[in-house]
Amino acid sequence: MSTENLPQSPEQPPRKPRVAVVFGGRSSEHGISVVTAGAVLRAIDRTKYDVLPIGITRDGRWALTADEPERMAITDRRTPSVEELAESNEGGVILPVDPANREVVYSEPGSVPKALGEVDVVFPVLHGPYGEDGTLQGLLELSGVPYVGAGVLASAVGQDKEYMKRVFTSFGLKVGPYVVIRPREWERDESAARRKIVDFAGEHGWPLFVKPARAGSSIGITKVDDLAGLDEAVAEAQRHDPKIIVEALLRGREIECGVLEFEDGPRASVPAEIPPAQSHAYYDFEAKYIDSTPGIVPAPLTPEETAEVRRLAVEAFEATSCEGLVRADFFLTEDGDFVINEINTMPGFTPISMYPQMWQASGIAYPELVDRLVEAALRRSTGLR
């Protein structure tokens, strides 16, 4: 489906496609999702699209929010919330449940539901669980509403660091050493689970990185230099996800590459390099979004290295059956190998984020990037494909 073949009324001028920008959510990345939505709302072409902002509160309520992107920015080192933007503390937005009817409804207790009109495409800019992990995508598939980005399977795989690495390995992509501690392992025998990590450290050395298995934006990650810090690091990761993954330190350069789906298939951007953090132990949430640690775009690589990382980024996109967009993160080791760390199916998408910067350097400015993603979603059908 494209903007040219939307149903039209003979009495009215052609209507513009309606884009619902959905943001916020129940994950730890709620605030940065709001910031991302503000950037999309500022950039989207209002002469081409009608826009409906829908925020999901931290407790999961779908709220009609003010279309005021200027209020959706980081201020005083603090990210905004949907609760601050919601037009009501009680009302809720209801998606269509009939694929033949894409009308969205707004309902408040004790009031007659109000029709908000049809939605032609959803632009979900949620990060983390309950938004980027296939749950929202499944809801939209059931509703028959096209949406930007990866489908159910790719979103689920792209959110779980363990299964992502398993898929990469099965397709011949190199991954670093890791060990997974599942919730039942820790609950059943903490000592045995701890020994599993200590044995891993004995094989691969300290430091280790202890991470929530299904979180992003570097939230909940701790660099652990020795056994003394392990329990605290595990507790911090488990605050965000009962399943954790522990990774060995890979010595090398951090290289990122964006992938964007075109009509003739996915293409990779110029790569970027994340320089070693000066005031941070690693490239964490504060470095990414608060202190805005700049990346180097394009990355200072040889032509051969650039071609190889772009090829591998597209291969990772294809291996996980992604759609729309992906940011692929690699380490370029001292041996000259590219080791894939992870993909992000909805990467940081503010104008200062690496994904838009890489495409800016590749010739696609932020507003055009938003437009290409919406157009790709409109062309795509829901259901099996």
Swiss-Prot record:
Residue span(s) of domain ATP-grasp: 165-375
Residues at which Mg(2+) 1 binds: D329, E342
Cofactor binding annotation: Binds 2 magnesium or manganese ions per subunit.
GO cellular component entries: cytosol
Domain of life: Bacteria
Stretch forming the signal peptide: none
Record GO biological process: cell wall organization; peptidoglycan biosynthetic process; regulation of cell shape
PROSITE patterns (UniProt xref): ATP_GRASP, DALA_DALA_LIGASE_1, DALA_DALA_LIGASE_2
Biological pathway: Cell wall biogenesis; peptidoglycan biosynthesis
Keyword rRNA-binding: no
NCBIfam families tied to this protein: D_ala_D_alaTIGR, PRK01966.1-4
Described purpose of this protein according to its UniProt entry: Cell wall formation.
Protein name: D-alanine--D-alanine ligase
